[in-house]
Amino acid sequence: MKRRNADCSKLRRPLKRNRITEGIYGSTFLYLKFLVVWALVLLADFVLEFRFEYLWPFWLFIRSVYDSFRYQGLAFSVFFVCVAFTSNIICLLFIPIQWLFFAASTYVWVQYVWHTERGVCLPTVSLWILFVYIEAAIRFKDLKNFHVDLCRPFAAHCIGYPVVTLGFGFKSYVSYKMRLRKQKEVQKENEFYMQLLQQALPPEQQMLQKQEKEAEEAAKGLPDMDSSILIHHNGGIPANKKLSTALPEIEYREKGKEKDKDAKKHNLGINNNNILQPVDSKIQEIEYMENHINSKRLNNDLVGSTENLLKEDSCTASSKNYKNASGVVNSSPRSHSATNGSIPSSSSKNEKKQRCTSKGPSAHKDLMENCIPNNQLSKPDALVRLEQDIKKLKADLQASRQVEQELRSQISSLSSTERGIRSEMGQLRQENELLQNKLHNAVQMKQKDKQNISQLEKRLKAEQEARGFVEKQLMEEKKRKKLEEATAARAVAFAAASRGECTETLRSRIRELEAEGKKLTMDLKVKEEQIRELELKVQELRKYKENEKDTEVLMSALSAMQDKTQHLENSLSAETRIKLDLFSALGDAKRQLEIAQGQILQKDQEIKDLKQKIAEVMAVMPSITYSAATSPLSPVSPHYSSKFVETSPSGLDPNASVYQPLKK
């Protein structure tokens, strides 16, 4: 016959099977198998008077104990056995016998059908109803035919063991949920601190990060940004507060398609606004104090210049115009500083300068020359001291700002190092887990090999003993054979001499002995081959013992990795302590800023009080006349006139030559 090679490219297609008929036949066969098994078990129960279905949960319990001992250790397996034993005792003592047998049998059969591939469907439900009906109608009442005392512990185990497994499942579910909750809390805290550290960075770095994010999103094809951000890039937004409020809105719009992350991102945006609002308010307050101080200085200069201008225009203008001018000068910087917190605009200064120049440049210069020393003479020493204190406070404020910027840079560097350390920690943990898995597998293989070695050594000893026993038997058989041959020769000689009757029996005996000798030699050869195979296996196992040194190297590497992880954890804890110290220093700097701002407000209040006192003193002083020798062009006018003073309810006469108190 010729051998034909099959062509793989021209294989025949298998016949198509109808899935509907296959499913029907498979399901019917499966449920028929269930019914046959159930009927056989019931028949065995009735014949042997024992509930054999109770042995299945006991077998499951033994398997679970073996698995727990294999994977979780001896302590957990002992604990599991104790818990199962206590639950069995409770079910045995507190549940009535009939209900105990009914619940155990129904649970076993329902669980047996539940573990099929079909799951919950109409045939399984019908089988459950049949099992429950048979148990409740027939077997619930007939307990006299069974060995109740023998079956009762197994029935209690059929109920107690599932209760224990359900308890462990519930405990694992609760621990899983608690772990998830703890992870979410830690994630929220990390996001909060990360956002705080990002907001602590300088605005230039924030803008750079923002531009990089926008470039990445534009490259990915995300939707367009909000118009407010485009205006900010064009230079429309002057403040930092709009940036802080625009960031969460952008994140919310970009990630609005993901329904699960919507609420989380929105809450994070709100938290970011709440964090940024106090920082922006502090910055605005500092700017307001600086602008207020500058406005006060400008106000003092403008008061002196307006007094000179008003003296020049006293001959031509009425008192109302002077009052309006003074009111505008005095009120405009205050209103600007109170509402906007900014320095008065330079346009008002230019308008006032134009007014002064329109009335005569020479007269204005002379008036300014006369006015400057008078203002310098009228300023008290307290104002000079207050201005010096304000300068010192400004210097302290700038120093605190520099310290704050340095602290923020340190925080950003520490956060970057922390990220690197966390990534290294994750890598080291993964390597540690891999090494532990390798070590566990190596230990398991070592245990298995030890067991195999012990078994093979036992077999080798048994084979050696059998070999020695067979060799002894062979020697004895050889001796017997020699003796029998000698006796046979003698008998043959004797028989040949005397009679020839027993020759046939002796020949048959000799043949049987020869056959037995051949069998023994064959058995001896087989045993020798087995001994050789066992010796080869022993040599292989010895080689494996020599390879166990690699496991020791893995153990040393694992210990080194554990030491490294411990060192990294210690360094991470030290860095967290440094962060806490930096946060405390930042809080102290903010407190010093607040104290400086309070001192500036107190100094401003003292300046206002001193100005009021100066105004009262000027109102009480007598009118002083100046000689016309200084400037022949300017008319003689008093330094202070009653036209410039507003009508007050006091009874003092400012035109009197010498001040006289009122007579009551």
Swiss-Prot record:
One Gene Ontology term of the molecular function aspect: microtubule binding
The keyword Endoplasmic reticulum appears for this protein: yes
Transmembrane segments: 28-48, 75-95, 120-140, 154-174
Annotated signal sequence range: none
Residues found modified as Phosphoserine: S305, S332, S631, S634
Key words, A-Z: Endoplasmic reticulum, Glycoprotein, Membrane, Nucleus, Phosphoprotein, Transmembrane, Transmembrane helix
Cellular localisation: Rough endoplasmic reticulum membrane; Nucleus membrane
Single biological process term from Gene Ontology: neuronal signal transduction
InterPro entries xrefs: Macoilin
Glycosylated residues, chain numbering: N324, N340, N452, N655
Disulfide bond positions: none
A cellular-component GO term for this protein: neuron projection terminus
Assigned protein family: Belongs to the macoilin family.
Function noted in UniProt: Plays a role in the regulation of neuronal activity.
Protein name, entry field: Macoilin
Gene: Maco1
